[in-house]
Regions:
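Nucleotide/pyrophosphate-binding catalytic subdomain
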Residues: 1-104
């Protein structure tokens, strides 16, 4: 069975440092980008949804006393940061990317 389009959901922790899942590990990002490029070169269209838990978890920040709405926005910004990091790495593989967000 072959697919023309796939959706890849990545936890933000998949982009993080080994052992902790925090921050952004350039080696992890490059590895994922190479794997995505390999599949894309087979003619598969790939949409990627990436989390931001490696940067900040809004619920955790809120529990520590931050305003919930701000905490949620901070978490969403983490997803954008991850998306941009992954986008750069995929473009370095010669593919075209687009980062989309609902943040206003």
């Amino acid at each position: 069975m072959t697919y023309q389009r796939v959706l890849l959901k990545l936890s933000g922790e998949a982009l993080g440092e080994p052992g902790t899942g925090h921050g952004i590990d350039p080696d992890a990002v490059r590895l994922i980008a190479r794997q995505v490029a390999k599949v894309a070169r087979l003619g598969v269209e790939i949409a990627i949804v990436v989390g931001g838990g490696n940067i900040l978890r809004g619920a955790e920040f809120s529990r520590l006393g931050g305003h919930r709405a701000n905490a949620d926005y901070m978490g969403m910004l983490g997803t954008v940061i991850n998306g941009l990091a992954l986008s750069d790495a995929i473009e370095d593989q010669g593919l075209e990317t687009r980062v989309l967000t609902a943040i206003e």
